Amino acid sequence: MTGAARRPRKLKVMSASAFANTFAGNPLDRASDRRVDAAWMANRLAAPESLAVAMWNGRPLIEDAKSGGVQIAYLRAQMAGELSEGGERLLFMGLWKDVAVFALDIEGPADPADGPLAGLGRFEDLRSIALTLTAGDAAILATAKGVFEWRRRHRHCAVCGAASEPAEGGWKRICPSCNAEHFPRTDPVVIMLPVNGERCLLGRQAAWPKGVYSALAGFLEPGESIEEACARELSEEAGLKASAVRYHSTQPWPYPSSLMIGLIAQVEDGEAIPDQTELDEVRWFTRGEADALIRGELADARAPGAMAIAHQLIKAWANGG
C-alpha cells in the first residue's frame, strides 16, 4: 500500500437522546455477533476494501480534512494486520455498511509517522483535536482509545496473574492458565448541575486552571442507583440535599474508561459548603451569569470547554432547560 485508504461516506446516526456529547454517536455497526467468528474476521482483515484506524500511544493518526478541521487517516486493514504482532494489537471496530473497520494499537517511543506509516498522516492528541473532528470520527476514535487503554492496564489475569490473550476481535481477554474471561471496563460517573430556583452551583479545585468552575461529579458505587449516587455526591462535596434528579445526557470519556452520566439536580435551600477534599470552592451563579459564563463573558470565572459534558449541562440550564 502506498497511501492512506479512501474515506467512507458519512452515515446518519440515530440516537435515543436528542443530544449527543463529544465522543458519543459512533456511526459504525459494532457487529458484535461477528467477533466470535475467527474465520470471518481473518477474511475481512485480508479484504482489500477493509479499513483501519491507527493509534500510537493513545494518539490517533489523522489528516487535514478538505472541508476544514481534521479527519481520521484510514489505513488499509491489510497493512494494520501486518503491523499487529499476530493480532495482539488489533481491534475489530465494526462495519461501515459492508466495509469492516479495525483499529491498530501501536506503542513505543518512535513515531510511526516517521517509519512504517510515513506519508500517511500525523499522530495528535485526541483531546486536543476532538472539536475539529466530525462527531462520528471523534466517537470512533474514543471507542478505540477506550479499549486500548483497558488492554494496557489489564494484560494479566486478575484471578491468577498469568498473561492474558486477546479474543473476539480484541473485545475480550482470556487467561490460558485458569480460563478466566475479562472484558473492557466502563466506570460510571454521575456529573450533576445542582439547581435551586434561578441559580445553579458550580465548584472548583485549586489544581484547575485559574477561574474555571465546573459541575460536581463522582463515581457510582456498587449497590447505588444513579439518583442515590447524585444525592450522595451533593451531600459529600457541597453539603446540599437533592430533592429531584433529572437526566440530561451521557458522554463516553476514554480517560481512561468513564461513562459520564449528566444530570440536573434540584436541591433544597441551604448553605453550600465545599468539602475541601474534592472541592476547594463552590459558587452560586444566576441563570444570566451562567449564560455569560458559557459565552466567556464573565471576568472572574470560566466554564469547562465545549467538549466537556459539564459545559453542556450549564448551557442547557442557562438556556432554560
Model regions and ranges:
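Short, well-structured beta-strand/strand-turn elements
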Residues: E165-E168, G239-H248
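Surface-exposed, charge/polar-rich loops and edge strands
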Residues: E224
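Hydrophobic alpha-helical positions that pack around
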Residues: L216, C230, L234
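Cys/His-rich short segments
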Residues: T143-L193
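N-terminal strand-loop-strand
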Residues: R173-A215, F219, K241-A242
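Nudix hydrolase/Nudix homology domain
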Residues: G3-H154, E165, P209-Y213, D275-G321
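Active-site-adjacent beta-strand/loop module that shapes the phosphate/pyrophosphate-binding cleft
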Residues: Q251-P274
